[in-house]
Amino acid sequence: MEGDAVEAIVEESETFIKGKERKTYQRRREGGQEEDACHLPQNQTDGGEVVQDVNSSVQMVMMEQLDPTLLQMKTEVMEGTVAPEAEAAVDDTQIITLQVVNMEEQPINIGELQLVQVPVPVTVPVATTSVEELQGAYENEVSKEGLAESEPMICHTLPLPEGFQVVKVGANGEVETLEQGELPPQEDPSWQKDPDYQPPAKKTKKTKKSKLRYTEEGKDVDVSVYDFEEEQQEGLLSEVNAEKVVGNMKPPKPTKIKKKGVKKTFQCELCSYTCPRRSNLDRHMKSHTDERPHKCHLCGRAFRTVTLLRNHLNTHTGTRPHKCPDCDMAFVTSGELVRHRRYKHTHEKPFKCSMCDYASVEVSKLKRHIRSHTGERPFQCSLCSYASRDTYKLKRHMRTHSGEKPYECYICHARFTQSGTMKMHILQKHTENVAKFHCPHCDTVIARKSDLGVHLRKQHSYIEQGKKCRYCDAVFHERYALIQHQKSHKNEKRFKCDQCDYACRQERHMIMHKRTHTGEKPYACSHCDKTFRQKQLLDMHFKRYHDPNFVPAAFVCSKCGKTFTRRNTMARHADNCAGPDGVEGENGGETKKSKRGRKRKMRSKKEDSSDSENAEPDLDDNEDEEEPAVEIEPEPEPQPVTPAPPPAKKRRGRPPGRTNQPKQNQPTAIIQVEDQNTGAIENIIVEVKKEPDAEPAEGEEEEAQPAATDAPNGDLTPEMILSMMDR
């Protein structure tokens, strides 16, 4: 116990010496020599009683050894007596200067408390008491004698920096904030005369009290800390201590506190780029300019940044500093290494779409995918109306204008505009020279082994969540099985019209079909009053009739020389074309269209005469029977009723002058045939041939024609076939 008390007194003496050394601040400032103004009491330990005068009036708690985030208090207690005006105003209170503490910045590590002592006449025998008894004796002595005669005067040797507040702590623990006018008068510090000194700016503060309780050397100490929350500022807390300030002889500068959780971001004014650092923004701004100050001394190529230049120089020297830890490959840049590991080893896809389940290895591919949701096509061709979602497809499209073919077959040296076309050429034309890798799960044959690995990973890897078919509710855990299942829906006409029997495979076709029922034509021409059901019809109409620069493509039929604006129309015409001299088909037969129409007419006539056919006997079996009487009644003015022809549909490529005109009426005759068994009379219409030059003589009967005249091409007409069937 005695040893602990002695150690406590020795520590208090050492801290008192440190406080006295700061007293020489003003003298060194004025150039004077340092002189000690007080003598430390000597500790005498003679083995018996050890008596020491302890000046243990604690006036201030200095937090010198606290965490660097706390500002330190800098005060100095000087010996002397209080002025008569101040003696009357001092009561049982203590004036303490406290600092601003931001408790939310980071955890606080409470260090040692340094005690600055002022001599008070209290004598305690150290050998027979403890620290607790020492504190009790001090309180009793203070209550008896008071502090009127020996009250120390607190003199701030430094101006209160920003974040400090002076409070008055009463005997019972009351805390009162002192305003500037209530403080004792102080002389102007000498350092304010320094031309380099700048007083700190004052800012509004909010007071918040919090208590810290900690244990130091077995003693519980309750410290009240006042947290003055300032407005949001930038910067970090500077580590300031009393020794550094005294040595530099300059007051501390106000610190800027950055609150936790608030991140400062910088945004580009020309695009939506954001970054957390100013240096990143400056580097990004160079991408909006054509400035390339860093030039390669080997090839003359220039770059925006030094990093890009270094990576380029590695391509000249062959240096690949970034090596893959999973394989033997090395890369020029760290970005290439990261991309390689994600594609080949980790298969990580950190960039995910917020609208669907798509995920990508590269952020550029994610941006391109998002444009498929928004429909944005920012990359426009300068020579035509083509627009693309990414620059790669635009470059590939520009080759159609320039005629460039950068991809060459290594076998036959044929050149292509796209790499995919070249690969397909090699697989189709040079299969004997290409190594084939068969997929063990399906019939796919792949030329390269790396492509086989990609195929296995994408098509046959197990999917935990499973993917649902877009056409039905089936769920599959393998992409290949899902694709094969969806192919079964390919020819299925899932969309059916509710007003007719029309069905189709795609929804857009059903939408266009329903417009035939509603009569809706939403696409109107801006140059005339015509409207259309489809946009492509509107575009075609505009090009043909309103575009002065439009030159229609001419597709010429090789048989008759007709021209068409569409290839499929010309191909359909060529199948039925017989050449410029006739209307027969390619082999001299009838055209497909005429055959189809003739079959339809024959079918309708068969249905009309089905009843009479069932009632007629087989005339071929009754060879011995006599033929029925035949009467010919020529019609003076035959006017057969012919159905009105349907409106001619205007087709592209057909000359406007040619329309479907009905054939001229030929003289006909009606033959009445009476059946002897049933008595039924049937009328048969036959054509009568008349010679234009020779007229029949009087009294001479015209010979009935039991069958119609032959067709111009030598084939039987429907009337001839019906008459033969009746006989």
UniProtKB/Swiss-Prot annotation:
Q: Main localization of the protein?
A: nucleus
Q: Where is the composition biased (Polar residues)?
A: 658-677
Q: Which residues form a coiled coil?
A: none
Q: Which residues carry this modification: Phosphoserine?
A: S402, S609, S610, S612
Q: In which tissues is it expressed?
A: Ubiquitous. Absent in primary spermatocytes.
Q: What is the effect of changing K365T?
A: Found in an endometrial carcinoma sample; uncertain significance; no effect on its nuclear localization; no loss of its ability to inhibit cell proliferation
> Where does it live in the cell?
Nucleus, Nucleoplasm; Chromosome; Chromosome, Centromere
* Phenotype for H345R: In a prostate tumor
Which residue stretches are annotated zinc finger (C2H2-type)? 266-288, 294-316, 322-345, 351-373, 379-401, 407-430, 437-460, 467-489, 495-517, 523-546, 555-577
Q: Provide ranges: composition bias, Acidic residues.
A: 610-636, 694-704
Outcome following mutation: R278C: Found in an endometrial carcinoma sample; uncertain significance; no effect on its nuclear localization; loss of its ability to inhibit cell proliferation
Composition bias of kind Pro residues appears in: 637-647
The record's section on Pfam families has: zf-C2H2 (PF00096), zf-C2H2_16 (PF23611)
PROSITE patterns documented for this protein: ZINC_FINGER_C2H2_1, ZINC_FINGER_C2H2_2
- A GO term for molecular function: transcription cis-regulatory region binding
Region Disordered: start-end pairs:
180-211, 573-677, 689-717
Q: What modifications does the entry list under PTM / processing?
A: Sumoylated on Lys-74 and Lys-689; sumoylation of CTCF contributes to the repressive function of CTCF on the MYC P2 promoter.
Task: Name positions with the PTM N-acetylmethionine.
Answer: M1
Q: Per the record, where are the segments of Basic residues compositional bias? A: 202-211, 593-604
More details: More than 13'00 CTCF-binding sites in potential insulators were identified in the human genome.
Free-text note regarding domains? The 11 zinc fingers are highly conserved among vertebrates, exhibiting almost identical amino acid sequences. Different subsets or combination of individual zinc fingers gives the ability to CTCF to recognize multiple DNA target sites.
- Please give the clinical condition linked to this protein: Intellectual developmental disorder, autosomal dominant 21: A disorder characterized by significantly below average general intellectual functioning associated with impairments in adaptive behavior and manifested during the developmental period. Additional MRD21 features include short stature, microcephaly, and developmental delay.
Q: Which family is annotated?
A: Belongs to the CTCF zinc-finger protein family.
Q: What is this protein called?
A: Transcriptional repressor CTCF
UniProt organism field: Homo sapiens
